[in-house]
C-alpha cells in the first residue's frame, strides 16, 4: 500500500506529497537522535506499532513522554535495511491528543485564570483535596524538583503514582497555589509544556492551602461568602 503511493510521483508544486494523519496513538518509545537534533519514536494504536521520525524536533520540544497519546501528521516511507523492509512514518506535525474531558478541563482553567465568571458547580470541581496537593508535591520532589511536562501528562502520572482520580484541572490549581506560596517557579514552553522547578523544600508543619487567595476565591464562588 505504501509502495503504491509512488505512482503519484513526481511531487512538486502542482502535485504535493500526500500527507496523512493518525489520531490517538500511544507513544511507547522516544529518543533524540542525530546529535540531539531529531526525534525518533515508536507509537501504537489498535494493537499495531510503527516507527516514526521527526526531523528538527526534539523530545523536550514535543512536550510528550512515553505513555502519552498523540495526534500525528505524516507521509509514509519504506526503509530497506539488509533486506528487511519496514514502514516508517516521516512526521510533519505532532501534538498531544486530548479527550473531550481534558479539553473541557483546560478550557475551564483558562477561563478562571482570565478572571472570567464561572459557575458554583465549576468552582467546586476545581478545588483540590489536601491529598492532591500532597501528591503533586511528592511527585515533583521525587523527580529532583525539576520537571518538564504538558499538564495532561503531569496529571496522569501524579494520579497513577498516588492512586488518585486523574484531574488536569485540579492539578493545575495545585500548581498555581504552590507557586503562590513561593515554593516553585513555572515557565511555559513550546507545545504547551510547563517547566516546573521547586525553589525550596517544605520544613515541617502543614501549609495553609485553603488560606490561599486562589482557593478562597473558588470557595466563595462555590458556596458564597460564608463557604
Please provide the spans of the model-predicted regions.
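Acidic, two-metal ion nucleic-acid-processing modules in DNA metabolism proteins
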Residues: 1-227
